[in-house]
Amino acid sequence: MANKLRHIAISVRDPEATAKFFEQAFGMTRAGNAQRGVYMTDGIMNVALLNFGDEPIAGMEGQKNVTGLIHFGMWVDSVEQVDKAITAAGGSYVTGRKETGPNVYYEVKYKTPEGIVFDVTESGWKGAVKEVAPKAKAAA
């Protein structure tokens, strides 16, 4: 298996209204509730629509009323291996740690050399699918 982009977090003022927009405009469905909003899915990707209010956002401390892309997430085979690759490529650790329980969700956050925040996990996100089977070709 390979590392896969499977998560995007967006800071929005009204998660419910934004979720309805994603449903109507893109045909996405709700994958579940988040602590600060709603998880949406297209069947492969997870899009978290979150209202952080006045709470600090990991990697964006000190910024107020942030809207837009907060971070992206990579579903990886091994957090330990990708940690080494991230560090070797110039990335830096922000927060989080790998959990040991099989049914425990976790993510570890990093920054790219330019300061773009992203997270990695081996456990995935609600509504996301790591491996996608290719569609069978129609008979000619």
Can you name each region flagged by the protein language model?
Residues 1-19, 69-74, 123-140:
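N-terminal beta-strand motif that seeds the catalytic metal site of vicinal oxygen chelate
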Residues 45-49, 56-58, 115-118:
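Short, charged/polar, Gly/Pro-enriched secondary-structure boundary elements
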Residues 2, 9-53:
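Core segments of cupin and vicinal oxygen chelate
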Residues 23, 48, 73-75, 79-80, ...:
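A general secondary-structure boundary signal
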Residues 52-56, 123-125:
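Acetyl-CoA-dependent GNAT
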Residues 7, 17-18, 27-28, 71, ...:
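Secondary-structure boundary/capping motif
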Residues 4-13, 41, 60-140, ...:
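Vicinal oxygen chelate
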